[in-house]
């Protein structure tokens, strides 16, 4: 029976039996010839199973001929593929690494066998534990096709390789195409928007420089502010302010711990950017005279490493709200996912259904708050402010919800510049939660923002009576004392407040005020605090302590006209110095009070007054009537008349005057002094560690963001003309966009 089957089947059974009797991994030659039981079977197998031999296949010569044809065809096909660049080998190479199953670094037949279960992984590729090895090996053997023709398996392997190759190449091309299509392309708008974490304000022009404008505490008793002769910023009560009016109140800049910004959405607000911050000087200045003893203040890192006090999760649900918790959670989930419009609708529906639900009302306020930021809408923000009030006024509102609602209401009122409204909200908070010192500290800030130092002082005294170690209260109380010119009394409060490391105390202005107070009482420890402020990143250097800066500007105390690039302005001033002098003397002779006393408490003693022609880039028309030729002379020099961070003014100083060491507010300007009436001896100015004197008809140029000090020990008055100019490295765009100081 077997020979007949061989004759009909062409030797297929012989091959199968041979494979079955031998090992599963026999060679292809063995598998193809098989082990026949009779010579007849071998002969029939040789002739393809047909008795006359004509249809049993090809002869040996024919087989060789066809083999050569196929081989040559393969060679020429390969040449064609390479020559015509049909396959991008750069794209194929390395793409099959993921299929390297045997660990030999490439993908080949052995890898395919492993993937198909015909071969074990190399030891380096085994990922299963030893105890599972035997079981896994057995499974692989079971999966192997028993009795299968090995030649057929090899063909299948080759087919698998080709399919995997095609799949890999096409997949990679698809992925690249998808990546290019799906990758967000940079848009022009990306360069026009403010990259603020809150994303609250209007888009700015390309290249706009953002400024760190921090809270301004306006005080009645002005302190040395490191802003020599500068008029300070306008009051934050924006509802009553007139942008066209010149600033008339001298304020003292001081930070709020929360860094609340007082600004309507409609107005562009300048935030700190990577281009602005503390200016870093590349120039080495001799600090050898500065004391560098250690100060026992916890570093910022140490403060951050201190484990925070675990806060209790606020309880925002009353008994009724707990019954609708699922609906509240669903609406809140929309808000947290950024689906603001949907969340607003959801909470509005909840408020409609459950008008007495404090949590629903509070959620509505939060959504309106978020929507105001998204749309940059003052109107929506005002709605949010009212809704926060409504949530706090509902009966049976949880105390935590009342506190959070009113606190946020106060913050958003401050944001809009509604300082009085914010103060009323803070007063109510303190009445409801009299033991919460944090709220009292915020109330003190509210009074300072309105310029009510006396009320703020009382608040901080109350806080310190209850919690004597409250660092936030100490630095603010010390600041108020210094503003009242109680220099010695302010020092321990400022010092201990900074040393506490409490939130809101690590601010450059507190370091400055402490150092300034120490300098005034002759305490050389002042420079230790300046050094620490520099190390903390608040000051560019021990000498350069301005707070409103643009990073990367050249920093050096003294400049030459050539270095500034404003040689024409300098030449014009020096050519016309007598004209400028004569008009200044005429204004003095009129004795109409046009020269105003310096009112920033920068003098230790003496008499120092100024007559201002330009301030913050705005011309004083009335003042220029007293010096018309001088004003006409300056009109063509926009680097000074357009300098919104400086002034143009006459400065007269009488004998016996000493101006404390102080620092200007910004590194964005340079200051020119033109000598008009200079006594032969006794007048000098120090900037950083170099002291110079004035000459009549000559211009001195220095960077007043560096510490400087003035002495007038002559026997007659000294008159100079002060001209501020933009720092020469500021771009035109920066000069347009930087806010005025």
Curated annotation (Swiss-Prot):
The modification Phosphoserine is found at residue 15. Residues 26-40 have a biased composition (Low complexity). Disulfide bonds join 624-631. It holds the Pfam family TPR_8. GO terms for biological process: cell population proliferation; face morphogenesis; limb morphogenesis; negative regulation of cell population proliferation; pattern specification process; positive regulation of proteolysis; regulation of protein depolymerization; regulation of protein stability. PROSITE patterns: TPR, TPR_REGION. Monomer. Isoform 2 interacts with CASQ2. Fe cation binds at residues 662, 708. It comes from the Eukaryota. Residues 84-741 are lumenal. The chain crosses the membrane at residues 63-83. This is Aspartyl/asparaginyl beta-hydroxylase. It is an enzyme of class 1 (oxidoreductase). Ca(2+) binds at residues 100, 102, 104, 106, 111. Its cofactor is Fe cation. Coiled coil: none annotated. Residues 8-25 have a biased composition (Gly residues). InterPro entries: Asp-B-hydro/Triadin_dom, Asp/Arg/Pro-Hydrxlase, ASPH, IPNS-like_sf, TPR-like_helical_dom_sf, TPR_rpt. TPR repeats lie at residues 324-357, 365-398, 437-470, 472-504, 508-540. GO terms for cellular component: cortical endoplasmic reticulum; cytoplasm; membrane; plasma membrane; sarcoplasmic reticulum membrane.
């Amino acid at each position: 029976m077997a020979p007949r089957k061989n004759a009909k089947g062409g030797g297929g059974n012989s091959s199968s039996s041979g494979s079955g009797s031998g090992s599963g991994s026999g060679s292809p030659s063995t598998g193809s010839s098989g082990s026949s039981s009779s010579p007849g079977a071998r002969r029939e197998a040789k002739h393809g199973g047909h008795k006359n031999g004509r249809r049993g296949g090809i002869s040996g010569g024919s087989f060789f001929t066809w083999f050569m044809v196929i081989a040559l065809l393969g060679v020429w096909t390969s040449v064609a593929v390479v020559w015509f660049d049909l396959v991008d080998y750069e794209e194929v190479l390395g793409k099959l690494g993921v299929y390297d199953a045997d660990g030999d670094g490439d993908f080949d037949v052995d890898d395919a066998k492993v993937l198909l279960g015909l071969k074990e992984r190399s030891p380096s590729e085994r990922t299963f534990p030893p105890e599972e090895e035997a079981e896994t090996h057995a499974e692989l053997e079971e999966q192997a096709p028993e009795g299968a023709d090995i030649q057929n398996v090899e063909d299948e392997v080759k087919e698998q390789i080709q399919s995997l190759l095609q799949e890999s190449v096409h997949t990679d091309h698809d992925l690249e195409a998808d990546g290019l299509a799906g990758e967000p392309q940079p848009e022009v708008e990306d360069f026009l928007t403010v990259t603020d974490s809150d994303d609250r304000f209007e888009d700015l022009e390309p290249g706009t420089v953002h400024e760190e404008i921090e809270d301004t505490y306006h005080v009645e008793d002005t302190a040395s502010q490191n802003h020599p002769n500068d008029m300070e910023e306008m009051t934050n009560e924006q509802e009553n302010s007139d942008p066209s009016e010149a600033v008339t109140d001298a304020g003292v800049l001081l930070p709020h711990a929360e860094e609340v910004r007082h600004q309507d959405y409609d107005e562009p607000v300048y935030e700190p950017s990577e281009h602005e911050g503390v200016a870093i000087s590349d120039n080495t200045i001799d600090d050898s005279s500065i004391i560098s003893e250690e100060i026992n203040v916890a570093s910022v890192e140490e403060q951050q490493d201190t484990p925070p006090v675990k806060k209790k999760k606020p309880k925002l649900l009353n008994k009724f709200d707990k019954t609708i918790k699922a609906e509240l959670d669903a609406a809140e989930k929309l808000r947290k996912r950024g689906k603001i419009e949907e969340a607003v609708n959801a909470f509005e529906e909840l408020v409609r259904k459950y008008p007495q639900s404090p949590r629903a009302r509070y959620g509505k306020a939060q959504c309106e708050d978020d929507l105001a930021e998204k749309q940059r809408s003052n109107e929506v923000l005002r709605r949010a402010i009212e809704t926060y009030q409504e949530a706090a006024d509902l009966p049976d509102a949880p105390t935590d919800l009342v506190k959070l609602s009113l606190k946020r209401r106060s913050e958003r009122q401050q944001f809009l510049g509604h300082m009085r409204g914010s103060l009323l909200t803070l007063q109510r908070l303190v009445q409801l939660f009299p033991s919460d010192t944090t709220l009292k500290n915020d109330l003190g800030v509210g009074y300072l923002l309105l310029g009510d130092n006396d009320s703020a002082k009382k608040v901080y005294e109350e806080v310190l009576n209850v919690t004597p170690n409250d660092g936030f209260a100490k630095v603010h109380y010390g600041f108020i004392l210094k503003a009242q010119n109680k220099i010695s009394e302010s020092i321990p409060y400022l010092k201990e407040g900074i040393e506490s490391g409490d939130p809101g105390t690590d601010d450059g202005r507190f370091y400055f005020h402490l150092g300034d107070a120490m300098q005034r009482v002759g305490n050389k420890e002042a420079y230790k605090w300046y050094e620490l402020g520099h190390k903390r990143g608040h000051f560019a250097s021990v000498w350069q302590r301005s707070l409103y800066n643009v990073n990367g500007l050249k920093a050096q105390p003294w400049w030459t006209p050539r270095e500034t690039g404003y040689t024409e302005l300098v030449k014009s001033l020096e050519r016309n110095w007598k004209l400028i002098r004569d008009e200044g003397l005429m204004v003095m002779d009129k004795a109409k009070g046009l020269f105003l006393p310096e009112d920033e408490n920068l003098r230790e003693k003496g008499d120092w007054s100024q007559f201002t022609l330009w301030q913050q880039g705005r011309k004083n028309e009335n003042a220029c009537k007293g010096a018309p030729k001088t004003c006409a002379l300056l009109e063509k020099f926009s680097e000074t008349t357009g300098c919104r961070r400086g002034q143009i003014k006459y400065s007269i100083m009488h004998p016996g005057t000493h101006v404390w060491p102080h620092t200007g507010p910004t590194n964005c300007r340079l200051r020119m002094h033109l000598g008009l009436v200079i006594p032969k001896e006794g007048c000098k100015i120090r900037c950083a560690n170099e002291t110079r004197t004035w000459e009549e008809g000559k211009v001195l140029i220095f960077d007043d963001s560096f510490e400087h000090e003035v002495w007038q020990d002559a026997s007659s008055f000294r008159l100079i003309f002060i001209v501020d100019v933009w720092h020469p490295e500021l771009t035109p765009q920066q000069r347009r966009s930087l806010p005025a100081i």
